[in-house]
Amino acid sequence: MKHSFINLLNHPDSFLFQYEDSCVRFEEPDSYEEKVSKIDYTVENNAGKITLYPSERPIKRVKLRWRGDLSDGLMVLGDAYARGIQDINWMGITPNHIMPWYFHLYDGEKLNCFGVKTGAAGMCSFQCDPFGITLWVDVRNGGCGVRNKEPFVIAEVVCREGKSIEVPFDSAHEFCKQMCNNPVLPKEPIFGVNNWYWAYGNISHESVMTETDYLMEMCRDAKAKPYMIIDDGWQINRYSAKRQGYYNGGPWDKTNANFKSMAETSDAIHQKGAKSGIWFRPLQTFMQVQEPLEAPRRNPHSPTGINLDPSHPDVLEMVSKDTAMIRSWGYDLIKHDFTSIDTLGNSPYNEDGDWHFYDRSLTNMQILKRLYQTIQNAAGDAVVIGCNTINHLVAGIHASQRSGNDTSGRNFEITRLACNCMMRFPQNNAFFNVDPDCAAFTEKVDAGLNLDFLENCAITGAVTLASVTPGILKDSEMNRIRGIYEVASKGGLGAKPTDWLGHNVMSRFETPDGEKFNFDWYRGYDGVRTFYTWND
């Protein structure tokens, strides 16, 4: 019998608290403090519930440790904090490696899985070594300890022992279903176009109409209506770095001069036979607001404008009104962006410090989860896609999540790197409908490679979107994209990767009836491109 599984439903062997006033050496044995906080670990419905009680000393993190024998483990694969940034990779047992939310451990025969259920109140990260498993639960508010007034469940721990007869990818998918009891899934397939990666914000009502006509030509054989998604570039305030500093926030009740009315644009899209979609950034504005509504920290990548504090009830009301207004314009899909960055920055791990949100009784994850639920409630029956959002919080709230990094209409290497997010395909239709981002069709990128990317999305049943310069496709390319969109409109072919284990970019896929696909992501540069920039 392989030594590669520890039952996390057993009571942890140890707990350790990091308080707001803990010393830097709080993990050193000679710095251990007598526990002054209460925590419970109870097993209900095959999950270990971690309940944290109010503490006189605000708590920042809780460390739980299960000791056991994992000496036969060969490889581990963790998830990403929010969207993947080429960081979802198989590796050998690496004890200091942080694995957000959950991880898989392969022992050469079976895949064992360890994690927490979606919707956790704390930011959860695992570490694994041959002698045990460590779980860190980050319950900070901003960079400070949480000041919770009542006991609350900070995470629900789950695990799954694999079987040697299972395909590892299937084991991972089953575990994702175990982590998310009530996924929200789209009623119809999400496919069509998003105009970001060919227009990069240079759009108008007229360009959207031209694009919609081209979309309907590409989707001539589709069995459902496609989406025409209007991305960044419609709002009244938008500046590029070459002008007044980069800004792409609100207010959202006004358009720029290139659009007369976003409701009229949505209606015109519908009249052409497509569904309408639109993008917005809910937590950034140029509006003057009272100081308590401002976020405690400014996003360094957006030096202009104001970031809003989503823990404040007035901010939630503003976001709700904006979302409901956009839905009232007739948009069938709403994509909201940047909420994780506008609240916590690019990484949750390096944000310690004396800063906090307006409501100090909530953790960072509770604040964001409440924001996502507010947006979904206001969107009504519209499909919502989260971008730059926390995937483990979006699950069970939104129908889709942008799971990977940006693709590109400027060079394919960025798109190839974004293929790493397909390592998250076990989450597809278990958490939500995975959105790998857009294939791009411009004069600067290879159409064949992007058709492969789009087909990969379609055959697996993932969100299938492209950014297509109107009129750019050759006849052969048009014929192929029609076939791809037809497959996407039917919900895909049920294709699964056959090279998920041990890789970080998958190439080989097979359908249940034995049809095989092999995508060569490296032929564009005869390998990989090493020297490039996002803008070239």
Regions found by a protein language model. Give the residues of each.
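Aromatic- and carboxylate-enriched substrate-binding clefts and catalytic-loop regions
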Residues: 102, 224-443, 449, 477
